[in-house]
Amino acid sequence: MDKLAIQASPPLAGDVIISGAKNAALPILMAGVLAETDFVVSNVPNLRDVSTSCKLLRCLGADVDELGEGKIRISTKNLNEFCAPYDLVKTMRASILILGPLLARYGTADVSLPGGCAIGARPVNLHLHGLEMMGAKIEVKEGYIKARVDGRLKGAHIFMDMVSVGATENLLMAAALADGETVIENAAREPEVIDLANCLIAMGAKITGVGSATLRIQGVERLQGCEYRVMPDRIETGSFLVAAAVTRGRIRCLKADPASLESVIAKLEDAGAKITTGEDWIELDMEGKRPKAVNIKTAPYPGFPTDMQAQFCVLNVLAQGTATITETIFENRFMHVPELIRMGATMELEGNTCIIQGIESLSGAQVMATDLRASASLVIAGLVADGKTIVDRIYHLDRGYEHIEQKFQGLGAHVERVQ
């Protein structure tokens, strides 16, 4: 099984090209099921979850051609299966996003209950409740969600009890082909939801309120394929910016989207980073200084993203001062803390808050990745730890970061993949 071996590295320096956003690419690939003609998606990152999504679409009978350079073509003319099996779904929570498109277009879907990162309950009840309001008959048995609808789904007024990105995306896709108007209130406002909505509009969907907490979807008879480019990955961008800050370096993230990262950029500036942005690039310069501790509280967009929490834990571990990090989105999302403590970090958990006393340095150690973003934080910690750090179970990392060791090497980091 692959591991990453990391040696203490110099301050990161240079340019890094940001990949397409995993969390936008996955729902957009699932949206291909809604299209009656060929659908081409570009800027798709080469990741394990993307490969799993393509396998799932092929399992349903869709023709999926990987055209190279991050471009994928999907044709549904031979789609004739409506079951997303356990073997595929167990490795990736985003598989649940096939439910809405299958049900809306074909009236039937059997989807295994999902797997993915082990970071809390992430219930699917919001997805199911919304689809039931649109007329679906749903039962959960033998580990599968079995959904049926006679004719077409019907437009409905859906109020989400809590903000959920996945449920918003599933209901948005289902509503695009429903009969009549659907209103989704308390909808997620994440940039990836906006990207999906813009993709659906390019396919012929009628959606208003994009980017707000109230989405209005006027169902249409059919959707056509189009060519669509996935947005840049804001979490990958943020991860490299934090790595540069922790190593007191200076980097530029190219093909990035500064507008989607405002909360992260603000916290990096609070930590002492000098940040300059252009339309599609972000430069961070620590000017050789140690970062200052910053308090973080995660929140739905436009608040601070939960997917950047672990990386800022590492920043605060090596910062000047004491900080608190409060996680409000997922329970069980501090699994990186015991690993960082093994490297010498001074951290204490109190409920959903981590109290961190900044120290001068860490010690290299063998550590274990527990989920996608926790693994990124351990890599960043390894860059500034004395001696050698081995990060085990990096299949988590490969689910969300494209060519991570090559990108770090390009910035001067001592990182290599080993068996």
Curated annotation (Swiss-Prot):
EC number: 2.5.1.7
Gene Ontology, cellular component aspect: cytoplasm
Annotated catalytic residues: 117
SUPFAM superfamilies the record matches: EPT/RTPC-like
Keywords from the UniProt entry: Cell cycle, Cell division, Cell shape, Cell wall biogenesis/degradation, Cytoplasm, Peptidoglycan synthesis, Pyruvate, Transferase
List of residues binding phosphoenolpyruvate: 22-23
Catalysis performed (reactions): phosphoenolpyruvate + UDP-N-acetyl-alpha-D-glucosamine = UDP-N-acetyl-3-O-(1-carboxyvinyl)-alpha-D-glucosamine + phosphate
A Gene Ontology BP annotation from the UniProt entry: regulation of cell shape
Official protein name in the record: UDP-N-acetylglucosamine 1-carboxyvinyltransferase
Modification sites for 2-(S-cysteinyl)pyruvic acid O-phosphothioketal: 117
InterPro entries: Enolpyruvate_Tfrase_dom (IPR001986), Enolpyruvate_Tfrase_sf (IPR036968), MurA_subfamily (IPR050068), RNA3'P_cycl/enolpyr_Trfase_a/b (IPR013792), UDP_GlcNAc_COvinyl_MurA (IPR005750)
